Amino acid sequence: MRNRFDQQLELLNKQLIHMGELCEEAIGKATTALKEGSMEQAEKVRIADEEIDQAETDIERLCLKLLLQQQPVARDLRQISAALKMITDMERVGDQASDIAEIIITEEKSEALDIPMIIKMSEAAAKMVRDSVNAYVEKDLELARKVMENDDVVDELFEEVKTTLINFIAENKGLQGVEAIDLIMVAKYLERIADHATNIAEWVEFSITGIHKSSVV
C-alpha cells in the first residue's frame, strides 16, 4: 500500500515539474513576443495558458485521489496540501503571462523603447518559479527561502522600471507614451508572477517545516 502511495507522490512531483515548466515557457514566450513584437509568440502564450489550466485540473484530481484513497501521515498530508495551494499560484502565473501577451496582441509595437530591465525582470521571475517548484520536489528549504529573498530583487527592478517609464511618459506624448504605459503594465504583471513564486516557496516551507509564514504571529 505504501509503495503505491509513494509512486503516486512521485507522479505528483512529475506533474508539478511539468506545470512549472509550462509556466516558465509561458513567461519566456511572452518575453520573446514583447522583444520581437511577435503575434505568433503571443498566441503561443494563450495556448500555454490553456495547458497550464489543464495541468492544474489534473494535479488537483490526483491530490484529491491521494487524500481520499490513501491515509497520508502528517508529513505526506502537508506535501499534498502544499501542492494544492501551489497549483493555484502556478495557474495565476499562466494568467499573468497571458495578460502580457494580450498587451502585445492589442497594441502596436514601436522600436523606440529599449526594455532590458523588463527582460531582466522576466528572467528573474521565471527563475523564481523554476526554483520554487524544484525546492518542493527536492524538499530544499534553503532554496525555497532564497526564492522568497529574490522577491525583493524583482520588486526593486519594478520600481526602477516604473520610475524610468514615468519619466519617459512625461517627456513623450502620443504612441510612445502609450507604449510606455503598456510596459509599466507588463512590469507589474512580472512583479505579480514573482509574488506568486514567493507564495509557492512559502508553501514549500510549510510542506517541510509545518509552519506557514502567514500563521507566524
Task: Describe the residue ranges of each PLM region.
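Cytosolic, long alpha-helical scaffolding segments
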Residues: 1-217
